Amino acid sequence: MSARETAIDALLLQREIEAFYYHEAELLDDRRFDAWLDLLTDDIVYFMPLRRNVKYGSQEEAENSAEGVDAAWFDEGKHTLSQRVAQIKTGIHWAEEPLSRIRHLVTNVQITDAPPGGHGARELDVKSRFLVYRNRIDDETDIFVGQRTDRLRHVDGGWKVARRVILLDQSTLLAKNLTFFF
């Protein structure tokens, strides 16, 4: 494969992954949660650690709570994510009645690990930045900013999220709840 073909393959893969993320954001914004769940592998790990304020130089080992060891905002699999969706869909979920108005913005999508040749990859590691805007009732507004580190797996002709680590850029949660998905 020539350098030009390799570069074109990389661009096509980048565009394909960006389109996947834009589609995922649209599903969440439109409350099409069952379709969103279909974008997740059955063995997904969905993890959002607590963030700590730490001294410079110790952020690598101490800034985030440890997966499977410490408390976390989310440490879930497909079953618990499906239960959360089912609860929202009952119409009696107190934190989502009335429903929130939500927009997901995804940017700075970077494929951080892909096999050479890229476009035929079965799994990819991808980082992205997000901004989630939420408005509830008349005057409750929340803005969440952070980074997602995903493992995407190519399954049945399309991409699915096999692992998602969400780093929220807040050490203290400023919102009343986390009833939506990142």
Locations of regions flagged by a protein language model:
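Short, low-complexity N-terminal intrinsically disordered segments enriched in polar/charged residues
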Residues: 1-42, 54
